[in-house]
Amino acid sequence: MLDIRVIRENPEEVKARLKPRSGDAWKLVDDVLACDEARRNAETEKQALQSERNATSKQIGMLKKKGEDTSSIEARVREIGDRIRELDRVAEENAAQLTSLLMNIPNLPHLECPVGADETANPEIKLWGEKPAIENPKDHVELAANLGMISFEDGARITGSGFVVYRGAGARLERALINFLLNTQTVENGYQEVGVPFVVKRECMEGTGQLPKFEEDMYGTEDQQMFLIPTAEVPVTNLYRDTILQESDLPIKMAAYTPCFRREAGSAGRINRGMIRVHQFDKVELVQILKPEDSFRELEVLRSHAESILQKLGLHYRVIELCTGDLGFSSAKTYDIEVWAPGQGQYLEVSSCSCFTDYQARRMRLRYKDADGKNQFCHTLNGSGTALPRLYVALLETYQQPDGSIRIPEALVPYFGADCIRPEQA
């Protein structure tokens, strides 16, 4: 969440930076200021009354020693006590309302973030490789069906639409990709692998910013206190909630494989056909916790770690920077990496790399002790390193052969155990 002091001291600047975002969150700034002022006024009056009560109580003791009547003064003490209790209620109510408002205000976009209303204003900043020349490319649905690799029908029968069953070489390829992703990010790029639960508490979802805004998109228990994770970002970052780290502990770099669960699955049609948008998918997530002065520089490094996966697999991709209107709720700056899928004839997002500044850390109370011994909020980064099954889709469609087989990229062969998937092998 945003620092209340920043809002208090620079309300018009905060509004100006929030206005280019989608939605009307900037309108909440005045409500925040009103709640903050009411809470602070209640606390100020309470402190004054407590001082008066202390002084009056001493006066009562002195008067009683002299045998003088103290009934009127004692009445005032009772009156003060009643007022203090009322002020406690007012302060508590306004503090709760203030927290609720702050939880619904997104992060401030980085000052150099491109300004735009939606994804059509996202600039392309990098292009790697070339689109493969494939005559009449088949899409992954047809390719995988012919090879018996995946079944949407089985997924629908077991669970419902938007779920996939992998079989034979299809399941083997998914496992190979996961191991390839993890090994690349841990062995080569220096992340510590962590294994985390796939179910988290509500407070963890609030900590990384998925709640309260995106609650309808999440799978939760009936009382909405426990949730299936939409991304490993949630449990991994929350490993350090309510923690004060030492400066020497930073940076912390973690990578985790998890399945991810999301209710939203998009509309029907070719753009969402097959595995493009599903309710459950696998992903390797990268998370960094670091000092504020390092965060935007390291975002570029993290992005290169995600890009390295596509380069090793020889997949054509582009990088776009999200404009203010397309920026994620908790993010100050985001790059999307989109891989080319020949059978779809479009780019598919496989990684989103973001810097959250101290936004998540404030929600999680994640701090570190600096060289002067003062507690400072950490900055957090995360990015997909990368997501499946869109990577799976691009791989099938890019390496399809005229005979219907799928060539396995050289970097993946040691993990898959073969250099090709043929109908008789699937």
UniProtKB/Swiss-Prot annotation:
InterPro entries: aa-tRNA-synt_IIb, aa-tRNA-synth_II, aa-tRNA-synth_II/BPL/LPL, Ser-tRNA-ligase_type_1, Ser-tRNA-synth_1_N, SerRS_1_N_sf, SerRS_core, tRNA-bd_arm. It comes from the Bacteria. ATP binds at R262, R263, E264, V278, E349, V350, S351, S352. It is found in: Cytoplasm. Pathway: Aminoacyl-tRNA biosynthesis; selenocysteinyl-tRNA(Sec) biosynthesis; L-seryl-tRNA(Sec) from L-serine and tRNA(Sec): step 1/1. GO terms for cellular component: cytoplasm. Its EC number is 6.1.1.11. GO terms for molecular function: ATP binding; serine-tRNA ligase activity. GO terms for biological process: selenocysteine biosynthetic process; seryl-tRNA aminoacylation. SUPFAM superfamilies: Class II aaRS and biotin synthetases, tRNA-binding arm. Residues 47-59 have a biased composition (Polar residues). Keywords: Aminoacyl-tRNA synthetase, ATP-binding, Cytoplasm, Ligase, Nucleotide-binding, Protein biosynthesis. L-serine binds at T231, A232, E233, E285, S384. Belongs to the class-II aminoacyl-tRNA synthetase family. Type-1 seryl-tRNA synthetase subfamily. Consists of two distinct domains, a catalytic core and a N-terminal extension that is involved in tRNA binding. This is Serine--tRNA ligase. It comes from Akkermansia muciniphila (strain ATCC BAA-835 / DSM 22959 / JCM 33894 / BCRC 81048 / CCUG 64013 / CIP 107961 / Muc). The gene is serS.
